[in-house]
Amino acid sequence: MGQKINPLGLRLGTNQDHYSIWFSQPKAYSKSLQEDQKIRSFIRKYIQNMKISPSGVEGLARISIYKRIDLIELRIFLGFPKLLLENRPQGLEKLQITLQKELNCGNRRLNIVITKVEKPYSNPNILAEFIAGQLKNRVSVRQAMKKAIELAEEADTKGIQVQVAGRLNGQDIARVQWIREGRVPRQTIRATFDYCSYPVRTIYGILGIKIWIFVGEAK
C-alpha cells in the first residue's frame, strides 16, 4: 500500500513546502480553508475563459496562497502567461477586482503575482492538461502518454511516470495503464517530486490521470 500514498504529503516538512501558508484560530479554520478553495476554483475558471494557450492547454502549474492579517498574496505559476500578460495591467486588474468582490476581503488587501514557469512541460499539472486534451479528442491513451513523456524529456526531466485509469479507449472493463521513463524513486524520502492527480471527463466516463516527475535528491 505504500506506493499509493501522495508523494507530496509524504515529504511535507522535509523537502516539500505547503501551497497555502497562514494561521487561523480553530473556530475560523474551516472558513479560511473554504476561502482557499474558492480562490483556487475562481482563478482556474478565469484562466479557462482567457484561453491562455492556443494549443488548448491552460498552463496553470500551481497557486500559492500567503495570508496575513491585512494582506492576501496570491502567486500564480503559469506555463503560458503570454495572453494574460499582454493585457496587463488590465487583465490582472480585472482579475484582482473581481476576486476581491467574490471574497469580500473587507480591510484586507489582495496582491496577485504572475510567475512564468520556464519549462512548462516539466510540470505535471500542465502535462496532465495536455493528456486530458488529447483524450477528449479521442487520441489513444498510450499515444497520448507517449507524447507527454516526449515533451517532458525535451524539458530535461530526470524521470517521469504517467498513469491513466478508467475505461480506457471505451473498453467495458476499467483498467490501469502506465509508462515510466528514467528514474522514479517514489520510496526515497529525500527524493524531490512534482506530482498531480487530474480527473478528465470523456464520452466514455471519467478517467484519472496521475503523473510523477522526479526533480532530484535533497542533500
UniProtKB/Swiss-Prot annotation:
Subcellular location per UniProt equals:
Plastid
* Predominant localisation class: plastid
Q: Where is the KH type-2 domain?
A: 39-118
Q: Which GO terms describe its biological process?
A: translation
InterPro entries on file? KH_dom-like_a/b, KH_sf_prok-type, Ribosomal_S3_C_sf, Ribosomal_uS3_bac-typ, Ribosomal_uS3_C
For this UniProt record, the keywords arranged alphabetically read as follows:
Plastid, Ribonucleoprotein, Ribosomal protein, RNA-binding, rRNA-binding
What's in the GO CC field?
cytosolic small ribosomal subunit; plastid
GO molecular function ontology, one term from the record:
rRNA binding
The entry describes its oligomerization and partners as: Part of the 30S ribosomal subunit.
List the HAMAP family: Ribosomal_uS3_B (MF_01309_B)
- Family note: Belongs to the universal ribosomal protein uS3 family.
Under which name does UniProt file this protein? Small ribosomal subunit protein uS3c
